[in-house]
A protein has these predicted regions:
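Surface-exposed beta-loop interaction hotspot
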Residues: 92-154
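Short helix-loop boundary/capping segments
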Residues: 131-194
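Beta-strand/loop nucleic-acid-binding surfaces
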Residues: 55-75
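Flexible glycine-rich surface loops and low-complexity tracts that mediate binding to linear polymers
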Residues: 70-100, 223-226
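Short beta-strand elements
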Residues: 230-251
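Short, solvent-exposed, Trp/other aromatic-anchored flexible loops in extracytoplasmic proteins
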Residues: 75-78, 186-229
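Beta-strand elements of well-folded, non-transmembrane domains
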Residues: 90, 153-157, 184, 205, ...
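Bacterial Sec-dependent N-terminal signal peptides
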Residues: 1-44
Length: 251
């Protein structure tokens, strides 16, 4: 079977603070059928966890819980956002129009940075200028409840995810306006770094929900607009269209 590659939007996922977990050195791993960035969705009383893919909208169901053993953190919970190699169950094949597949092997390639939207934006005291909201490899995308934001920043010290916050600002017709804010840094910072963070929409938070519910979808499509403070008083803006029902489906 011809291998399917990640869509171009997912190329070059390199972050100065991505926690990577790769295959053993010198071992190319199983002969995977495809590679995906996925969201790990917890199971219900009717079944175990499944993987929801970003690139093609596929759902991957493991044939046994042990298939996802490599996606567990030390506390036994599953990482929510990961890049993986996937081996389809024998007899399965990628078919046009088919969106659900059973998988026999899943290999962890990288753990993505992920966190919730900030719902206490009023407490964020500092805001430092970002270099850009996109890079040559990635633009923002939104799927399965996550807004995925690649960005470039400047710093004089080591930073982590907790130094960057995305929060909802307002609804404008079919658009949810958000802001990405860097709260740790220095005005004379000179080192440049790049990162990708998957921000989860907190639909269980009433303040966020009130803003989101004011967005008016057009045939289920909404726009997520990410803004940020840029250098030299420039306002950075990046937008993406996504499915309103898909974004709410996993909360």
């Amino acid at each position: 079977m011809k291998k399917m590659k990640l869509a171009a939007i997912f190329a070059g996922l390199v972050s100065v603070f991505t926690f990577s977990s790769c295959l053993n050195d010198g071992d190319s791993g199983p002969n995977y059928d495809l590679y995906e960035i996925v969201t790990v969705e917890d199971g219900s009383i009717f079944g175990g966890p499944v993987l929801k893919g970003d690139a093609w909208g596929y759902t991957y169901t493991p044939v046994a819980s042990s298939v996802l053993a490599g996606l567990k953190a030390s506390d036994g919970s599953y990482y929510k956002r990961v890049q993986v190699g996937i081996k389809l169950m024998e007899g399965e094949a990628i078919t046009e129009g088919k969106k659900s597949y059973k998988v026999s092997e899943v290999g962890l390639i990288a753990i993505l940075n992920y966190k919730d939207f900030n719902v206490q934006a009023a407490t964020l005291k500092n805001e430092y200028a970002l270099v850009s909201l996109e890079d040559s490899n990635n633009k923002i995308w939104a799927i399965n409840g996550y807004v995925n934001v690649p960005f470039t920043f400047k710093t004089k010290e080591q930073l982590n995810m907790n130094d960057f916050h995305l929060y909802a600002v307002e609804a404008k017709e079919d658009t949810l306006v958000t802001r990405l804010q860097q709260t740790k840094g220095a005005d004379d910072a000179y080192q440049t770094g790049g990162a990708l963070i998957s921000f989860h929409m907190p639909f269980n938070d009433m303040e966020f929900r009130d803003i989101f519910d004011q967005v008016v979808p057009k045939s289920d499509t909404i726009v997520v607009k990410v803004t940020a403070k840029g250098e030299n008083d420039k306002e950075l803006v990046s937008t993406v269209k996504c499915s309103a029902s898909n974004m709410q489906g996993s909360y």
